[in-house]
Amino acid sequence: MARIAGVDLPKKKRIEYGLTYIYGIGLFTSRKILDKVGISYDKRVHELSEDEAAAIRKEIQENYMVEGDLRKQVAMDIKALMDLGSFRGLRHRKGLPVRGQKTKTNARTRKGKRKTVGAKS
């Protein structure tokens, strides 16, 4: 099993899809990396030689922010929005949708389980 950027890639998948298991690398970026390194998209992860895996590791390390560093950067960006007091920061703080979706109905993922308000007994 190839280990790249601290992630074990699935052995039997094609390398272009295997790289997408790394946080911060999607299909487009995966193909860009493979083009730059000169590896075919059709190659399977378990078919990679040690030199090819090292070349992919080097390319990702030098040119892309992935995994822990990227997660940390995203968290810091959200914290900065909240500290600024921007509209988006307030929405993050309140746990509501940030991108203008309606909230009278739906938005359950962000709002959580329904809470009954003002039930009379």
Curated annotation (Swiss-Prot):
Pfam families the UniProt entry points to: Ribosomal_S13 (PF00416)
Gene Ontology CC annotation, any one: cytosol
Gene Ontology BP, a term: translation
GO molecular function, one term: tRNA binding
UniProt keyword terms in alphabetical order: Ribonucleoprotein, Ribosomal protein, RNA-binding, rRNA-binding, tRNA-binding
Chain residue ranges for the region called Disordered: 95-121
Subunit composition and interactions: Part of the 30S ribosomal subunit. Forms a loose heterodimer with protein S19. Forms two bridges to the 50S subunit in the 70S ribosome.
Cross-referenced HAMAP family: Ribosomal_uS13 (MF_01315)
Similarity-based family: Belongs to the universal ribosomal protein uS13 family.
Function noted in UniProt: Located at the top of the head of the 30S subunit, it contacts several helices of the 16S rRNA. In the 70S ribosome it contacts the 23S rRNA (bridge B1a) and protein L5 of the 50S subunit (bridge B1b), connecting the 2 subunits; these bridges are implicated in subunit movement. Contacts the tRNAs in the A and P-sites.
UniProt protein name: Small ribosomal subunit protein uS13
The encoding gene: rpsM
